[in-house]
Every structure is written in C-alpha cells, then in structure tokens.
C-alpha cells in the first residue's frame, strides 16, 4: 500500500510540474498578480472619487469619512485597553483575598510567637518578684530582730541602773562630799588662778602708785628748795 501511495503521489507531482511548464506561470504568481490588480483598481477608484470630489466640492466629505475610518480603529483600541484595565482590576481584587489569606496566616504565627514571648517574660517577672519579696521579707525580719535585741539589751542596762542607784544611796555622805569635790576641782582651780592673777595685777599696780606718789612728793620739795 505504501509503495502504491508513493507512486501515485509522484505521478500527481509530475502532472502538476508539466502543467506549470506548459503555462510558464505558477499558481502563487497568479494569485499575487490578481491581488495587485485588485489593489490597483481600488486605488484608482479612490483617486477618481477624490478628483470628482475636488471638482464637485465633496472633498470635505471624503476627508470626514477618512477621519471616521481612522477614528474607528483608535476607538476600538481604547475600548480594548479599557477592557484590559478592567480585567486587570478585576484580577487584582480577585488575587488580593488570596494575598490577604497568607498574610493572615503569617500574622497568626506571629501572634502565637508574641503570646509565647509575653508569657516567658511574665513568668520571669513573676520569679523575680518572688525573689524580691523574699529578700524584702528577710530585710524586714532583720530590723525586727535588731529591734528585739535592742529592748533585750536595754533591759539589762535598766536593771543595772537601779542597782547603781541603790549602791549610791548606800554610800555615806562623806563619800558624796568627796565625789562632789572630785567633780569640782576644775572650776575651783580656774577660780583660784583668776584670783592669783588679780592679786598679781594689784601687787604690780601698788609699786607703781607708790613710785608716783614719791615722785609727787619730791617735786614740791625740790620747788621749795629752789624757792
């Protein structure tokens, strides 16, 4: 079968080649020539209309038609762009919820992490607060113990004072006088020293006064002698 198909195809090709050789023109060339003829005739028709319009004053109408033809593709392009823009805007809101979902999913772990982080510092703060309270309790207990020791020490002192008072009461008046004298010597010595200084000053002043008196007596005697 394959051999038959190949043979038939070769025969058909040979027939086509023979026809092309006889005509001298390929079908592609024929189509191209026909298209060029149509375009040339169309252009000639347009040029003729333009010439007639110029003669009759229909040129503005032709220009308006040409502008309308030019504006129509532009309007179509704008509409296409607007359609594409709306499609993109619709796609953007459609995709935004999807983007929000991962963001929410990302926020959830972050919130969990924050919760864990807050719980850990809170536990640490609680532990530190307990240690501080224990330290304060120990410090509070230490002053109380000191206060307890203070009255305990004061009690023996107070107990010693009445004993000393009783001993002092038991002593004789002579001992009291001796104690008062022993306490007073500094003042007495100061008074005695002041008295001695005053006496010395008086003794020094007396010779000076006597010398002055003697001089006063000698002066009248000398005056009498001179007289």
From Swiss-Prot:
Biased composition (Acidic residues): 216-227
Phosphothreonine, modified sites: 138, 172
Record's keyword terms, sorted: Calmodulin-binding, Cell membrane, Cell projection, Cytoplasm, Developmental protein, Differentiation, Growth regulation, Lipoprotein, Membrane, Neurogenesis, Palmitate, Phosphoprotein, Synapse
Short name of any one Pfam family annotated for the protein: Neuromodulin_N
Gene Ontology cellular-component terms listed: axon; cell periphery; cytoplasm; dendrite; filopodium membrane; GABA-ergic synapse; growth cone membrane; perikaryon
MF (Gene Ontology): calmodulin binding; lysophosphatidic acid binding; phosphatidylinositol phosphate binding; phosphatidylserine binding
Modified residues (Phosphoserine): 41, 86, 96, 142, 144-145, 192-193
Biased composition regions of type Basic and acidic residues, renumbered to the chain: 9-32, 54-84, 98-127, 146-158, 202-215
Induction: Up-regulated after memory training in radial arm maze experiments. Up-regulated after sciatic nerve injury.
IQ domain segment(s): 31-60
Domain of life: Eukaryota
Entries under CDD domains matching the protein: IQCD
Chief localization: membrane
Disulfide linkage: none
Positions where lipid (S-palmitoyl cysteine) attaches: 3-4
Family assignment from sequence similarity: Belongs to the neuromodulin family.
PANTHER family according to UniProt: NEUROMODULIN
Biological role stated in the UniProt entry: This protein is associated with nerve growth. It is a major component of the motile 'growth cones' that form the tips of elongating axons. Plays a role in axonal and dendritic filopodia induction.
This protein's name: Neuromodulin
Gene encoding the protein: Gap43
């Amino acid at each position: 079968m394959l051999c038959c198909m190949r043979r038939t195809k070769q025969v058909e090709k040979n027939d086509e080649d023979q026809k092309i050789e006889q005509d001298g023109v390929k079908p592609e060339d024929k189509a191209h020539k026909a298209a060029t003829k149509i375009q040339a005739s169309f252009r000639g028709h347009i040029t003729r209309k333009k010439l007639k319009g110029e003669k009759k004053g229909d040129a503005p109408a032709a220009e308006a038609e040409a502008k309308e033809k030019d504006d129509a593709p532009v309007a179509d392009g704008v509409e296409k762009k607007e359609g594409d823009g709306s499609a993109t805007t619709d796609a953007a809101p459609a995709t935004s919820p999807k983007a929000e979902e991962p963001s929410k999913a990302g926020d959830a772990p972050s919130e969990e992490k924050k919760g864990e982080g807050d719980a850990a510092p809170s536990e640490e703060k609680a532990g530190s607060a307990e240690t501080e309270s224990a330290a304060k309790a120990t410090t509070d207990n230490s002053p109380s113990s000191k206060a307890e020791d203070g009255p305990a020490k004061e009690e023996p002192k107070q107990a010693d004072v009445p004993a000393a008072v009783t001993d002092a009461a038991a002593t004789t008046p002579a001992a009291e006088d001796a104690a008062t004298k022993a306490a007073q010597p500094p003042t007495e010595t100061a008074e005695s020293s002041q008295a001695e200084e005053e006496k010395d000053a008086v003794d020094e002043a007396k010779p000076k006064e006597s010398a002055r008196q003697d001089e006063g007596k000698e002066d009248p005697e000398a005056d009498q002698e001179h007289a």
